[in-house]
Swiss-Prot record:
Quaternary structure and partners: Acetyl-CoA carboxylase is a heterohexamer composed of biotin carboxyl carrier protein (AccB), biotin carboxylase (AccC) and two subunits each of ACCase subunit alpha (AccA) and ACCase subunit beta (AccD).
Entries under PANTHER family matching the protein: ACETYL-COENZYME A CARBOXYLASE CARBOXYL TRANSFERASE SUBUNIT ALPHA, ACETYL-COENZYME A CARBOXYLASE CARBOXYL TRANSFERASE SUBUNIT ALPHA, CHLOROPLASTIC
Family annotation (NCBIfam families): accA, AccA_sub, PRK05724.1
One term of GO molecular function: ATP binding
Localisation per UniProt entry: Cytoplasm
Role this protein plays: Component of the acetyl coenzyme A carboxylase (ACC) complex. First, biotin carboxylase catalyzes the carboxylation of biotin on its carrier protein (BCCP) and then the CO(2) group is transferred by the carboxyltransferase to acetyl-CoA to form malonyl-CoA.
Enzyme Commission number: 2.1.3.15
Catalysed reactions, semicolon-separated: N(6)-carboxybiotinyl-L-lysyl-[protein] + acetyl-CoA = N(6)-biotinyl-L-lysyl-[protein] + malonyl-CoA
Main localization, broad class: cytoplasm
Short name of any one Pfam family annotated for the protein: ACCA
Protein name according to UniProt: Acetyl-coenzyme A carboxylase carboxyl transferase subunit alpha
Organism: Klebsiella pneumoniae (strain 342)
Amino acid sequence: MSLNFLDFEQPIAELEAKIDSLTAVSRQDEKLDINIDEEVHRLREKSVELTRKIFADLGAWQVAQLARHPRRPYTLDYVRLAFDEFDELAGDRAYADDKAIVGGIARLDGRPVMIIGHQKGRETKEKIRRNFGMPAPEGYRKALRLMEMAERFKMPIITFIDTPGAYPGVGAEERGQSEAIARNLREMSRLSVPVICTVIGEGGSGGALAIGVGDKVNMLQYSTYSVISPEGCASILWKSADKAPLAAEAMGIVAPRLKELKLIDSIVQEPLGGAHRNPEAMAASLKAQLLADLADLDLLSEEELLNRRYQRLMSYGYA
């Protein structure tokens, strides 16, 4: 599988290309006099060292590119790798089934949970079918329907956030996009079951918040969370999307800054090079975080859960 190296990863890409070339030569002619295995091992070590060096000092714009990486694991990847017995549930029972949001019942270490998350799609046809992960009102109403079902059956709710934002089309506005988002914010704030939210890629504005109100909010190491994209901010403030790197730094969209502001609880570390380099390891780390969060929330009574969630929401912002 191609790793789809980003611009800032080009030195790594060049090393990996050399490794691939040597490996191919070795396969074609096993009678070569030189020790290719030794050279490949040396280059692999150099690649790991270079990756560590580059990823030790990433800027906000580089993190934003990683959050959008075409090979980055999506909601259904984590469902497959970290959960069992997933049964997808569809439709908002009012208009349609929005494929930009997926949801259903699964088991996390044997425990029934409700999973809800954005799904972007990989290939062109799937991207179009899932509207590039930008939900319409019916997507958020489907999410709310599943949350209410989880509450009735006393199941914890786990959400995965990965969207550039709610769909801004005319049809979505006509069908009540803002109302659907606002209703989700209100209803999620008073659900009587544990709610754990994790930003796994892009956390874009209200489109992310509509499934992002919870008792625990986590972010993967190279995910982002913001009220607008860096390009959108740059276009407004500097009249040019070329200023996106500057906007990304100014907006504080990365996990360490958001944890510093107490907008999130935990940062889930990613494998070296990002989640797309080792989805299985990433899923294992995420699963461990979810289990730890559930164990913590299980200690609370319903009243304590709701009071703590309320206090959390009221603490947002500056005095």
